[in-house]
Amino acid sequence: MVLRKTYHFSWRDYTLEFGRQTCIMGVVNVTPDSFSDGGRFYDHHAAAAQGEKLVAEGAAIIDIGGESTRPFSEPVTVEEEIRRVVPVIEKLAQRVSVPISIDTTKAAVARRALEAGASIINDVSALRFDPGLAVLAAEFDTPLILMHMLGDPKSMQVL
């Protein structure tokens, strides 16, 4: 008999249990050029509906992104990224009970997303693009997921 360890990760009003079953993060990219969905959820209403669908299908976290990180993608301004993600997060925060993460490399975007109802920061640059995300995570007492990316979207395929 193999004993499995389980871990409980709690913050704010959320608790995730790791070790008993797979914890799925559903991803909704609110971009016109997403490599995973081809921009199908660029509309705020379609994006929120997709988030709800992912929760109904078993997602334990919903990740909302407003800037593509596909190879050779162009960066977007803070204002544009906020315009894309905040309305979706506001809608989902009222409709789902799972944590919502904001996929961003910018502290200004993360701040607005957290104020709108997100409760996790997911940074694909691992703080290389904006170390202020760590300070913001501490200020909001919220988890910070650090991802790995070689270079940036414009250069990661040639490094």
Could you say what each language-model-derived stretch is?
Residues 19-24, 59-60, 94-98, 118-119, ...:
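Short, well-ordered coil/turn segments that N-cap beta-strands
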Residues 74-102, 111, 138-149:
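Alpha-helix-loop-beta-strand connector modules within alpha/beta enzyme cores
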Residues 95-105, 119-129:
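Catalytic beta/alpha-barrel core
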